A protein has these predicted regions:
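Extreme N-terminal, non-catalytic leader segments
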Residues: 1-12, 34
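NTP-dependent small-molecule kinase module
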Residues: 161-217
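ATP-dependent small-molecule kinase phosphotransfer cores
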Residues: 41-102, 108-112
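P-loop (Walker A) phosphate-binding loop of NTP-binding proteins
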Residues: 15-17
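Conserved phosphate-donor/acceptor-positioning beta-strand/loop module used by diverse small-molecule
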Residues: 102-107, 117-140, 171-172
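Post-Walker A helix-loop "phosphate-sensing" segment adjacent to the P-loop in P-loop NTPases
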Residues: 31-39
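Conserved lysine of the Walker
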Residues: 22
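Post-Walker A alpha-helix
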Residues: 25-26
Length: 217
């Protein structure tokens, strides 16, 4: 079922410390649900092995990123781990125009800025099952130097501390379970009365029929 048949599209923010698994979860949700579209972010960092420009990120030079920021092309942007990351307004508009929820995997800074501009956004924090597991995931990244690893650990601590700012927290102990939990959150949020504007006329029609039945009794 497409979102157009259910209600009004809304932004969905997935945040997690580096190595928290938010990108894997986002890909699964987009692959399994036709009411979700992915907003590809921009970054100035170098691509990791296997990453593809336009699918994982739009990889920009610092100069190109700054030019886009000056033009007001970003809905939000932030500096994370020494690199710039940003969400393009046109990416958000593209997904909304297709009648789908806009799914974004962005950091805590970006989530704060985006939520100011889009207060209807649903924020979900992906929490690792333990600090030890997160450290193992970070250590497995071949692109991590010792200095970069230490920076990511410090930043991860600060990001986990911000989890209380989110409407939902999902522990990513097992990918299938985490994806299922977030899918349930999307279904529940989509069924909220204030998001079902498309059903207003149907609600009024049911009330009218019941009123007529009572009046005719």
């Amino acid at each position: 079922m497409t979102l157009a048949a259910r209600g009004v599209p809304f932004p969905v923010i997935l945040s997690a410390p580096s190595g928290g698994g938010k990108t894997s979860i986002a890909r699964r949700l987009v692959a399994e649900r036709n009411d979700v579209g992915y907003s590809v972010s921009c970054t100035t960092r170098a691509p990791r092995p296997g990453e593809i420009d336009g699918r994982d990120y739009y990889f920009l030079t610092p100069e190109a990123f700054d030019e886009a920021a000056v033009r007001g092309a970003f809905a939000e942007w932030a500096i994370v781990h020494g690199n710039r990351y940003g969400t393009l307004k046109r990416e958000v508009e593209r997904v909304i125009a297709a009648g789908r929820h806009v799914l974004m995997d962005i950091d805590v800074q970006g989530a704060r800025a985006f939520s100011v501009a889009f207060p209807d956004a649903v924020r979900i924090f992906i929490l690792p099952p333990s600090g030890g597991v997160l450290l193992e995931r970070l250590a497995m990244r071949a692109s991590e130097s010792a200095a970069s690893f230490a920076l990511r650990v410090r930043n991860a601590r600060d990001e986990v501390a911000a989890a209380h700012e989110y409407e939902y927290v999902v522990v990513n102990n097992e990918l299938e379970r985490a994806v299922a939990q977030i899918a349930s959150i999307l279904d529940a949020e989509g069924a909220r009365r204030d998001r079902l504007r498309a059903l207003d006329s149907q609600i009024d029609s049911v009330i009218a029929e019941l009123d007529a039945a009572v009046g005719g009794a």
